[in-house]
Amino acid sequence: MLKIKLEKTTFENAKAECGLVFIVNKDFSHAWVKNKELLETFKYEGEGVFLDQENKILYVGVKEDDVHLLRESACLAVRTLKKLAFKSVKVGVYTCGAHSKDNALLENLKALFLGLKLGLYEYDTFKSNKKESVLKEAIVALELHKPCEKTCTNSLEKSAKEALKYAEIMTESLNIVRDLVNTPPMIGTPVYMAEVAQKVAKENHLEIHVHDEKFLEEKKMNAFLAVNKASLGVNPPRLIHLVYKPKKAKKKIALVGKGLTYDCGGLSLKPADYMVTMKADKGGGSAVIGLLNALAKLGVEAEVHGIIGATENMIGPAAYKPDDILISKEGKSIEVRNTDAEGRLVLADCLSYAQDLNPDVIVDFATLTGACVVGLGEFTSAIMGHNEELKNLFETSGLESGELLAKLPFNRHLKKLIESKIADVCNISSSRYGGAITAGLFLNEFIRDEFKDKWLHIDIAGPAYVEKEWDVNSFGASGAGVRACTAFVEELLKKA
């Protein structure tokens, strides 16, 4: 992992094998830009990367004066430096966007540091010829870019230390999620997921309760149990409950995650091509584990409960079937018409369990629907719920964190599509349209009236796992939901 070292020196005087200079909005007037004639000769116009071998400076373009593009460019920089086999790099302090805000410097330092640290991630556990990065150190010269001196009132050193702490915690938390989601299903079972949660709990002095199928039976969590029936005796289910309790808590927050460690679709079997990447169906539960790590280390003033429903959805003699009717923990009956709509069954019981804790806010995370990916693309998560203020807060704070989010509206016409003639609700819509929303409306059936305005549903099916590099994410798992929800909790507590 890349170590970031803060030094009270100028960029020119800092010692490293290579310098890193960002060209913001194609502006070459910065004092750190050397040998402009060379750049002109090679027609480098401030896009992509360019290595000045004579001065040992890597130039990286930042398309616009924007904090998110700075983060992405920092990530591109370390990936390039890794390929070039430099052992150390030095960089100065930049401010991109929002120059009128007092926290502009802090936010840009967070973006810079996070981009630098996330860029080197690669899931290579099973590669026999691992290529470990020789890039080990980034020196940050605490020299303030002159235009900032009039607009940023925060102390530079204080901001740098705060930003570095954030970047280190967020990188660790995201990598916990990435590693867990990327873990293949032969290893990443419900029991394994619980073991990862126990490690996080031990390191952060959290309470943890890991419940088996007997507990689920006692609590009448029959929808959850049904999904696991084909795996029971081989890979039994686990209800994982993590608890972070600070001395002073302004809010009680329940975070609920879908933890499908593998999903073949059950008897409503997926086509072979659609099964590939279904190890990532534990993205929501993994995000909750990462969030507990982040929120505990950041020391947020909220009591946070992380609830993960971990199970497989497989085929076998005991598998639950289309036409089954399940009685959920909430007491509502569910007509099963498609066993591949299983995540919502697990979440229904887990949300019921979460409501028993009487939280002030409930947020669930799930790789719930392919329809969400069709509607929003593979880089954007969906936000659903009843409370407009809460949805807006999650969207704005999440977007500021660097994640892409969009609100999807509930409506009475789509609600009719999950009605059942023989049970209280059907687990699948009667229409092929609006599938992301109808899945959210299904979950809504299990939210009690007193919690309707306290609940948000986040569908992370798109960005949780993408088979290519994008933004600050490597091939595979991204840790979707962690940055957004951390920012949401912090903003929520400011209003408490």
From Swiss-Prot:
Cellular compartment(s): Cytoplasm
Cofactor comment text: Binds 2 manganese ions per subunit.
A GO CC term assigned to this protein in UniProt: cytoplasm
GO molecular function, one term: manganese ion binding
Enzyme's top EC category: hydrolase
Any single GO BP term: proteolysis
Cofactor(s) recorded in Swiss-Prot or TrEMBL: Mn(2+)
Tree of life domain: Bacteria
Keyword tRNA processing found: no
CDD domains attached to this UniProt entry: Peptidase_M17
Protein name: Probable cytosol aminopeptidase
Origin species: Helicobacter pylori (strain HPAG1)
Gene name per UniProt: pepA
